[in-house]
Amino acid sequence: MSIIDRALEFIQEMNVIARRSEWEKRRCLHCGTPGAIKHGTYPRTVTDLSGPQKLRRQRYLCKKCGKTYAEEWAWVKPRHRYSRAVQRKAIDMWVYGRTSLRRVAEFVRSDIGQQERWRMWVGQVAAKIGILCLLHASTVCRWKNKAGVEAKKSIWQQLKGIATSGEMGTDGLWVNLKGKGKGVILALMDSVTGLIFPPVVVDGEEGAASWKQLFDRAEEAGLDLGQVDGVTSDGAQGLLSCLRESFSWVHQQRCVWHLWRNLGPKIRRLVMEDVADKVGEEAEEACAALTRELTGLVHRILDAASYQKGEEALADLAAHRLGKPLADYIRPLLDAILYHSMPCHQGLLRVGPEWIWRDFRQRVSRGRNHGADESWERAALLWAICWNFTPAQKRSELKRIYRRSGKSPLEMAGTPPGDVTYLDALRV
């Protein structure tokens, strides 16, 4: 079942509960026999976004099986003191609002109970008798963990039936967990739609087995690995080994930004060796001129519009008096540098998707508050589902074109979620 189907199923279940008639409420929840009789009520205090509400919950007795059950409410989970709206607000503030559990609890507490920070917001001292809301960070943490468990349950066929371009990008993020533990989270993203497949937490990214887990997780979520054509990455050897062993038809596009990181020191060393016999302004001018020449030649290779132009630029670099070492370094990588320019790889990015981790770190604290890999993985799965449902910010500029302006990755993939949210998919 896809993630959108899960959300629609949850909404349908809530609508059925909310629209039950008095006769339908008398159908036993245990054996399904109709005709249960009322069996008293009990008081229940439920805190909603408007504050605590003192209610009485009806109980029923089944004549056939002899068991009792309480009336179901769609707006509050069974055996919960806070409504679904409060839980959804708290989880959304943690995932999307990019704040800590303690601050989430404080903000929700202040808003519901008109206490603490609420007095600062209204700009006056409002007298209150007692504390109306006692929401604690540990309660928010428990809600978050339950949502993470639902996110992990939804991995199977999560993105089934959702179109993919076959051009992917992948990257990993290291983290220091509590107790001096370390781990790395690997993510696979569709370069055209921005859709992120469920991430996976592994011990390291040096081996092919770790990356194989990532592709297995994506296949479990509904990705047809046979349709994957290209993968943009930073040149991790573990990924390259994995592609050679298991996915020989997939081309690895090298990230241009990481190539510049490797080429920069080489260019600097060649230039400094060449101007070693010069001093003062003469050395500075010669150094700047040589750097411009070499970087310009390298730019022509990395920014080539076609493979033929890339080969011509590589020949020009090799002909330069200082360019042979650089040309020898680039020549074995030329295919991996220019895969994105080939007609069969339209949409393949030339830069790895490292920018997604900026969003992840801002939202879930980069693992500092996670004591184990399981907790961190649940947080990453929550973030990925939220990412796929959340539309990008609407932007319009004269000099830049935003491909996903105002659209979510699911909408870019041809499956707009509409009014369905990621919280519905998590059954919160």
Where are these regions (language model features)?
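Short, cysteine/histidine-rich loop/knuckle motifs that typically chelate Zn2+
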Residues: 29-33, 64
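RNase H-like nuclease fold core
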Residues: 61, 113-232, 237, 241-249
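Short, flexible, mixed-charge glycine/proline-rich loop motifs
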Residues: 14-25, 50-56
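Basic, amphipathic alpha-helical segments enriched in Lys/Arg and hydrophobic/aromatic residues
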Residues: 362-428
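Cys/His-enriched microdomains
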Residues: 26-29, 60
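Short Cys/His-rich Zn2+-coordinating modules
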Residues: 3-16, 38-50
